[in-house]
């Protein structure tokens, strides 16, 4: 199945250097071009978890961030929010350092899906994308010497030298797991099912224009896979709005 992959940084601000703490977690989005002509999208990031359990909580976090600029009185709205929400504080303060490459990080689809087979049996699962090259982070000296756009430069050279490979797996839910709470990571001891291998073997012809034209929708799913977390629906409703604003349509 042909795929298109987009890597990204967290902040959504193009001027944030790749070495900045605001750039993590990193993102990996995959579009599968299915045989019937439709697309299916998978969106993941490099932290196994999410800062909030619901979209309402996420809204409150974003409001707190917006009201906590450099001139805000202490404690800021964000300080107060994080004091009351330890999971969000952990998310914002325990990110990994800059990676050697986008190809040397694992990525996690933190929202759950319901998978149903032809016999009607269903299981809940979350996606994980595991780098065949293993996880590799920069050391302090490498961070100090890295350029602001080193990741996009590195991945281009890496793909030109040899295909980049990831394992795609599904981590199965077990009894007691929070199916609709992406802020709670499931234990690493849970069984995983190998779904296949993602192979990136060439860049697109016009990378800058092509990546700006991509809109990934996590509810674009094939038959047999359904959203099991209401946040997925909210994300698919919000992403087209941000997409249109980036392109000046709104």
What are these regions (language model features)?
Residues 1-250:
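Active-site-adjacent core segments of small-molecule enzymes
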């Amino acid at each position: 199945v042909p795929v298109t992959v987009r890597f990204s940084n967290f902040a959504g601000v193009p001027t944030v250097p790749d070495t900045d703490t605001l750039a993590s977690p990193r993102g990996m989005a995959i579009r599968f071009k299915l045989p019937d002509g439709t697309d299916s999208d998978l969106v993941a990031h490099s932290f196994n978890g999410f800062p909030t359990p619901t979209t309402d909580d996420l809204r409150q976090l974003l409001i707190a961030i917006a009201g906590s600029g450099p001139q805000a009185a202490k404690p800021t709205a964000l300080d107060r929010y994080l004091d009351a929400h330890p999971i969000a504080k952990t998310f914002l303060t325990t990110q990994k350092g800059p990676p050697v490459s986008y190809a040397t990080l694992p990525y996690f689809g933190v929202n759950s899906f319901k998978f149903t087979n032809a016999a009607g049996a269903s299981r809940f699962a979350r996606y994980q994308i595991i780098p065949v090259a293993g996880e590799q982070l920069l050391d302090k000296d490498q961070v100090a010497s890295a350029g602001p756009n080193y990741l996009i430069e590195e991945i281009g050279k890496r793909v030109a030298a040899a295909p980049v490979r990831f394992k795609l797996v599904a981590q199965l839910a077990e009894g007691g797991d929070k199916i609709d709470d992406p802020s709670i990571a499931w234990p690493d001891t849970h069984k995983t099912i190998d779904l296949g291998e993602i192979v990136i073997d060439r860049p697109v012809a016009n990378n800058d224009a092509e990546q700006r034209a991509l809109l990934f929708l996590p509810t674009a799913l094939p038959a047999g896979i359904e959203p099991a977390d209401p946040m997925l629906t909210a994300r698919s409703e919000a992403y087209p709005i941000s997409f249109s604003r980036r392109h000046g349509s709104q």
